[in-house]
Regions:
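An N-terminal-biased, well-structured beta-alpha scaffold segment characteristic
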Residues: 1-104
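Glycine/serine-rich phosphate-binding loop and adjoining beta1-alpha1 elements at the start
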Residues: 5, 76-184
Length: 185
């Protein structure tokens, strides 16, 4: 498994934690993790879990049998894709650039395992938005509400290092508000 660095600006998420990588290593998988200038999780955890560390954006030169794992879109170019890729490809519902991505897989002989279509035996989606996506969405909603109380717009929100950093920032915003919080978000 080759965990690639995300190329999309402001994308700090990663689909595999160091603990998950350690579990895969213990099960006999070889795990390579690319360096990343924007990933929220430090590379040291992956090193400590026994992962091989590769330079950022080295996945095109990964061994043929590597399964490339990422979350969001690949860089837009015409390079044929020869590997198996696990990601949210945004390619099968008429999304922008979907046809071009599929042509790249066809040209290179690679395969796209689109997480949007990963389902269990009953057809239930397995890679749907989880607890933390909802948690972050609620926090951002509260930040927007707090800004609106001062007739301003909520500014850009950068990635937080962890839940406590998010909560500290949110508490700071809410401390400026009257003791009359919203009843619904």
């Amino acid at each position: 498994l080759w965990v690639r660095a995300e190329q999309r600006p402001n994308e700090a998420r990663v689909g595999l934690t160091p603990a998950g990588a350690k579990t895969l290593k213990q099960a006999g998988f070889q795990v390579t993790v690319e360096q990343s200038t924007q990933r929220a999780i430090d590379l040291e955890g992956y090193s400590a879990s026994g992962c091989t560390i590769a330079p950022e954006n080295a996945w095109p030169d990964a061994p043929d049998d590597a399964v490339i794992f990422g979350l969001k879109e690949l860089p837009k170019d015409e390079t044929p894709l020869r590997h198996r890729h696990i990601m949210f490809g945004h390619a099968f519902k008429g999304q922008h650039d979907g046809k071009a991505l599929l042509r790249r897989f066809q040209a290179g002989g690679g395969t796209l395992y689109d997480l949007e279509y990963l389902v269990d035996d009953t057809g239930r989606r397995l890679a749907a938005f989880g607890y933390w996506a909802g948690y972050a969405g609620a926090a951002v909603s509260l930040k927007c509400w707090a800004a609106q109380q001062h007739n301003t717009l909520c500014g850009a929100i950068a990635a937080y290092t962890d839940k406590n950093a998010l909560l500290a920032d949110l508490h700071k915003d809410l401390a400026k508000e009257p003791a009359n919080p919203p009843r619904a978000i």
